[in-house]
Amino acid sequence: MTPMTPMTAAPPPTATPRPAFPGRWVGGASLVLGPLLLLTGVLLRLRFDFFFPAQLGAYEHHPHLMTASYGCVSAGWVLLWPGVALLAARIGERSPELALWGGVLTVLGLFARTFHAGVDHLAFRLADVQGAASATRTVSETYGAFHIFSTLNAAVMGGWLLLAVGACRSRVLGPLRAVALAAASAMPLGVLKGTTPLSVAAAAGLCAALVPLGVAALREGPAPRAAAVSGRLLLTVAAGTAMYFFGQAG
């Protein structure tokens, strides 16, 4: 008789390690800070009319308020990209195709919004030098000019919709928070856009969908040592200060 070979148990499945980049700290902070900055900036210009002549007029009479508003919004969009990368990675554990397309399109949309913020900045500098009336005339005459980032307008809106579907299907977000995430697609896009009810709904939806996810990401895993936290904070402050002065040097 052939001797029976002992049965060996199959090795337990190993969990897929989560990527080190952007990581829970950078990604979690992004998911918390980005939406809150967006909502703050949107609310700061709530009382002014939506279209660009009123936005430039508001800047002429309230330069500090409008600078803070547009600064918060542009910083919020930029800070969101690590959070989008983290969200796409979580979605990709169960829905890789939606994670890929949703993540790529959303990040491309963030690039487009950053371009719009640069044009906003130039328009406000024109208002400083030439006055709001002259800046309004210049913007009006050049408003429809083609730029390469206009090809990303669909990505600005569609990326959030794909991420919302992927987040719901992969159970990263529940149905209500997925709908709130999809509301980000309603944020008006383009140059010198003021605040509308859709703007407030979109920014509030991002806060409802992403801030709790960011807090949960920050709480995952073991708490870091106090020395490590202090060191990273000091490094962040030092790097930020150096980058600020380097940028001012031109």
Can you name each region flagged by the protein language model?
Residues 2-250:
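Hydrophobic, aromatic-enriched alpha-helical segments typical of multi-pass transmembrane helices
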